[in-house]
Amino acid sequence: MQPFNGILFCIHGFLGQASDWELTIPLELRWKSIDLFSKEALVPSPLDFRSFGEAIQKNVGDLPCPRVLVGYSLGGRIALHMLVEKPEIWSAAVIIGAHPGLSDEGERLRRIDGDERWAKRFEVEEWDTVLSDWNSQTVLIGSPNIERKESDFSRKTLADSLRGCSLGKQKDLREQIGKLRLPILWIVGEEDLKFLSIAKQLKKLNPRITLVVIPKAGHRAPWDQPEFFKKCLIEFLTINES
């Protein structure tokens, strides 16, 4: 088997930075990412899944093939929207700890309300307090917190993304994911039980999904176990080189 000669385009999660991927991508691989929440970021308007995807797409056009789309958490949800919109420009995808969308209207409304509360907090509250509370959410417990400086972020963009890209406003993409024909590596941490259950359901919908459960890892699986993640990535890309 030949080594992977393409490029990865990586989309970070909420409160993420492009540099986060440096800890998780093997040195021999080429990759690109952009900061979505920095004060210098070119923020689309209105800020939602479609506009985020279109803004990211502008950074993809000149990249060599094969191209592999990688997305973590919120970045994974953005990546899923991009895949169902224009699957033909990607050779494969790696989705990490991402939700395909809610099907229950009551859940949608509750999530929108919850994200609105977080958005207001990120707009006005003391940075260290809201950051600590964010990292104390059940889904993130068990993973080491990554240092985040207020000066590296636009509070307005963070708040706007919580509103515009709320899980409550996301389409339920299960049907479209089931129809995707490109190979997908779906990564989830062993201790991330909610997302592990979701990933198993999606694997049943699409035989092109390769599900990998990273042991001793939570929602931030690639950063909890970077060497294991690198190994999985290399194996997947080598097998699916095209």
Language model feature labels by segment:
Residues 217-226, 230:
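Catalytic histidine-centered segment of alpha/beta-hydrolase-like enzymes
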Residues 146-176:
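Hydrophobic, aromatic-rich cap/lid helix
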Residues 84, 90-122:
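Flexible "cap/lid" loop of the alpha/beta hydrolase fold
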Residues 193-198:
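Conserved alpha/beta-hydrolase "acid-adjacent" motif
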Residues 2-43:
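Conserved HGGG/HGGXW glycine-rich cap/lid loop of the alpha/beta-hydrolase fold
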Residues 71-75, 79:
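Gly/Ala-rich beta-loop-alpha elbow adjacent to hydrolase catalytic centers
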Residues 51-67:
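Conserved acidic catalytic loop of the alpha/beta-hydrolase fold
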Residues 180, 186-188:
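Short beta-strand/loop motif that positions the catalytic acidic residue
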